[in-house]
Curated annotation (Swiss-Prot):
One of its GO terms (cellular component) is DNA-directed RNA polymerase complex. This is Late genes activator. Residues 77-96 bind DNA. It comes from Bacillus phage B103. This protein is believed to be a positive regulator of late transcription. It may function as a sigma-like component of the host RNA polymerase. Binds to a region of the A3 promoter located between nucleotides -50 and -100 relative to the transcription start site, that presents a sequence-directed curvature. Full induction of this curvature is needed for the transcription activation process. Belongs to the podoviruses GP4 family.
Length: 125
């Protein structure tokens, strides 16, 4: 389904509203949701870490888990992600977040153009 007159994609797989941190890629249905994510993910990381630290004092990096949670809160029309150029399910992206908890820092998100099929294949190798 193509983009609507107001610039909304109902099929996230066709969307051109894309952000990436190098490994993970999130797709958005509208420019509004993409900007809402980019404007608020750092604040959400801080709030998420405060909540976790109230429960337990952990040295783990929870940023990616916070970003996935924020993405699912912001994007109301579905959930579509890639990991290193391959489609990733909700469960796979969470497993990735758990694996990255031992890394000292998480990369920041930036807007990218939607990669073409040839670029995806190159990333998969």
């Amino acid at each position: 389904m193509p983009r609507t007159a107001r610039g909304i994609y109902h099929n996230l797989k066709e969307s051109e509203y894309v952000v990436s941190n190098g490994d993970a890629t999130f797709f958005f249905s509208s420019e509004l949701y993409l900007n809402k994510f980019l404007d608020g993910y750092q604040k959400h990381r801080e709030e998420f870490n405060k909540k976790i630290n109230r429960i337990t004092d952990t040295p783990l990096n929870m940023d990616m888990l916070a970003d996935i949670t924020f993405y699912s809160n912001v994007e109301k029309r579905g959930f579509h992600t890639w990991l290193k150029g391959c489609n990733a399910s909700w469960q796979e992206i969470h497993v990735y977040a758990l694996r990255t908890m031992t890394k000292p820092c998480t990369q920041n998100w930036s807007r990218i153009r939607k990669p073409k099929l040839a670029e995806r294949r190159k990333n998969m190798v």
